[in-house]
């Protein structure tokens, strides 16, 4: 029996799910953002301007899908700015016309305050740096028909105690290109791993967090490849909800299948393939002569048997990271024990 861990569809669509325009603090208009991303082979962009949810149906066409969204902040205002912690959440609407959000006018979001009259909310509410409040907002945003992602914890100066208690997340950024390009080590695979081990069944994102064009490659540095049946809003949201995508800063995954207990990968040429789990079980495949890998196989039977024998079925998962010759990575989501047997 073959399980397709990544769906076999006609086409995978390239997406950036964290984008800012002149509606908030970006330098390009929504129309200019669309043009720049289409020129780089993207079909999907989530417009997630700070503090205001603005749909862009005027940008939709056969080969381009705009997703409605916004980015919300929760700041530790009492700290000096250079020490200020923050929670940032990207909220992506499951339907294109949905613009509900929580709103606190203290968060200006660049030009977003100019759109205050168009905001759909349940009234003004004060937001501060509180895990309890963040979880409440996540729960209400989920209930109003959004997917909620946790953004750039390294840029946000966050530690284990800040993120360990987060609940209800759909995804998190394992890579944020903007933060990386301005000097932060926002490769957050280790935080994703920690949150998986805490029981969060959620997905990894690589995003641009796009604000502007600049000489240091501030665009097309991180993306996801979405295995949707077609390029329309319901199909793409369905694929996002079920984790039918992978994140990348370079490598391409052509297929990821499980034949019995043997994991089979086909991909673009990479230097290394790593398999991580919740436990000491881990492995890496690479050619030490420098030859690139385009396929890999791993027999999971010993691990699966061990986890079952020790009653760890509810905790166990695998996930893959691919590293190419330039140091760029691709990340699969975690596949849990009950998906592997």
What are these regions (language model features)?
Residues 1-8, 12, 199-203, 208-341:
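C-terminal functional module detector
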């Amino acid at each position: 029996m073959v399980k397709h861990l990544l769906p076999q569809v006609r086409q995978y669509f390239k997406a950036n799910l964290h984008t800012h325009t002149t509606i908030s603090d970006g330098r390009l208009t929504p129309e200019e953002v669309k043009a720049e991303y289409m020129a780089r082979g993207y079909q999907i962009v989530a417009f997630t301007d700070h503090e205001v949810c603005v749909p862009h149906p005027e940008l939709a066409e056969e080969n381009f899908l705009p997703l409605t969204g916004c980015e919300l902040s929760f700041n530790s205002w009492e700290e000096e700015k250079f020490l200020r912690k923050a929670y940032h959440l990207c909220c992506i609407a499951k339907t294109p016309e949905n613009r509900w959000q929580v709103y606190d006018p203290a968060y200006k979001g660049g030009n977003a305050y100019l759109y205050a009259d168009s905001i759909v909310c349940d009234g003004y509410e004060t937001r501060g740096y509180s895990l309890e409040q963040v979880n409440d907002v996540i729960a209400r945003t989920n209930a109003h028909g959004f997917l909620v992602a946790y953004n750039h914890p390294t840029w946000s100066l966050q530690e284990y105690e800040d993120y360990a208690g987060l609940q209800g997340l759909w995804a998190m950024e394992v890579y944020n290109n903007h933060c990386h390009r301005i000097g932060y080590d926002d490769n957050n695979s280790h935080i994703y791993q920690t949150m998986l081990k805490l029981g969060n069944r959620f997905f990894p994102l690589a995003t641009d967090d796009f604000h502007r064009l600049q000489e240091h490659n501030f665009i097309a540095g991180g993306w996801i490849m979405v295995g949707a049946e077609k390029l329309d809003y319901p199909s793409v949201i369905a694929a996002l909800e079920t984790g039918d995508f992978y994140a990348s800063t370079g490598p391409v995954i052509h297929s990821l299948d499980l034949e019995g207990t043997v994991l089979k990968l086909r991909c673009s040429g990479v230097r290394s393939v790593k398999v991580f789990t919740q436990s000491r079980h881990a492995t890496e495949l690479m050619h030490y002569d420098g030859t690139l890998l385009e396929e890999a196989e791993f027999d999971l039977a010993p691990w699966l048997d061990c986890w079952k024998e020790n009653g760890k079925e509810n905790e166990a998962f695998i996930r893959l990271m691919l590293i190419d010759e330039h140091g760029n990575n691709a990340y699969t989501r975690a596949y849990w024990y009950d998906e592997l047997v």
